Amino acid sequence: DTPYQAHVWMVNTGPHTGDLAWVMGAVTFTDLDSRPESEEHTEDWMKNVMPNVKKVSDGEYWKQDEKVSYSPEGSFTGKEIWTVYDIVPFEGYRFTALLENVVEVYKAKNYPNYFQVYRSQFDGGNGHDVAIGFGFKNYAFFDEDEKFWKDYEEVHGEGSRWKFFEEYREVVKGSYDELSEFMPELSSGE
C-alpha cells in the first residue's frame, strides 16, 4: 500500500449532499514532503480532472486517533456515517474520555463495525474539531433496534448513559452527520 492513494466518497446526506469527497491517505505530513511529483501528473490533473470540478471546499487535514478508534479486521464496508463535532474550547480531554468509554463498549461486545476517530490538525474556524467514521454493511442496519446504549450500561453500569449525556452536553457545541459511500471506480485503493 502506498500513502498516495486517492479515495473518493459520494456524500448522500448532510450539508455536502451530492458532493464527492476526495481523500488521500492514510498519509503522514512527512509523506507529503516526498510525494511523487511529475509534470505529466499535473497536466493530467489540470486537463482531465479539474474541468469536471464545479467547486473545491473544506480542504482539511485530519489525523486518526488510534487510542480511541476501533477497527476490527475486515470491517471496511464502503458505507459510512461521518459525524463532525464542534468541541467547546479546552474541553477536548473530556470528549476524549467519552470516546474511551464508547470504544470500551465496542471492544467488550466485539462489534463488527469500525469506529474511527480523527482530529483536525488545523483550526479552520468552522467547528470541525473531531470527526468519527462509523462503518455499516447495509442500509437495513438503520431498521434494527438500537442496542448500543443497552450495551453501554452493561459495560459501564446502570444509569451510566445519562452521565455520558450530561458530559456530552457540556463539551460538545454542535455536530452534523453525513452518510457516504465509497466509489471504488474513482479511487486508487481501499
Predicted regions and their residues:
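Short S/T/G/P-rich N-terminal loop/turn motif that feeds into the first structured element of a domain
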Residues: D1-E190
